[in-house]
């Protein structure tokens, strides 16, 4: 098709296509734990940040998503017994998040899977070219 020349030169199409492929890849990778990518990132964050306080608003800012999206993920993780909400002692309207024991085990599996995926990317294209590509994509995406 004639449009293919345009598509082959379009960074927007390339990034969108890559995003769809990465979504499919992470869905497959996280299927055993029935997690989506954002839920996996939340578990990994809670694991790495512990014992520091993690608030949903911080997660929303960090992952550049809405508080509603984070709230939905937290509710899902909480329903599966992976995380718990704790009322903020300084502000009863707010709460902190913590991993439950099963959530900690799941977080370790998620971290291992994401780490392996990162190593696979680095092996496929090389560490330096991957970092260069990330810088380019971030510059196209604009200021964070």
Model-predicted regions and their roles:
Residues 75-135:
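Charged, amphipathic alpha-helical coiled-coil/dimerization segments
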Residues 18, 22, 29, 63, ...:
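Alpha-helical linker/hinge and terminal dimerization helices associated
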Residues 20, 24-66:
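N-terminal helix-turn-helix DNA-binding core of bacterial DNA-binding proteins
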Residues 1-33, 80:
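N-terminal leader segment of winged-helix/HTH proteins
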Residues 56, 74-75:
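Short, hydrophobic-biased segments on the C-terminal half of alpha helices
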Residues 16, 44, 134:
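A cross-family signal for key residues in well-ordered alpha-helices
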Residues 11, 38-41, 55, 102, ...:
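N-terminal positioning helix adjacent to the helix-turn-helix/winged-helix DNA-binding module
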């Amino acid at each position: 098709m004639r449009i293919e020349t345009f598509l082959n030169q379009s960074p927007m199409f390339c990034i969108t296509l890559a995003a769809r492929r990465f979504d499919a890849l992470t869905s497959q990778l996280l299927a055993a734990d029935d997690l989506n990518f954002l839920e996996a990132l939340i578990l990994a964050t809670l694991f790495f940040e512990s014992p520091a306080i993690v608030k949903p608003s911080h997660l929303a800012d960090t992952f550049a998503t809405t508080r509603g999206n984070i709230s939905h993920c937290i509710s899902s993780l909480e329903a599966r017994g992976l995380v718990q909400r704790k009322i903020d002692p300084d502000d009863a309207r707010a709460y902190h998040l913590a991993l439950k024991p099963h959530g900690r085990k799941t977080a370790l599996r998620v971290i291992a899977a994401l780490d392996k995926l990162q190593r696979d990317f680095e092996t496929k294209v090389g560490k330096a070219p991957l970092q260069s590509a990330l810088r380019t994509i971030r510059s196209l995406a604009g200021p964070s």
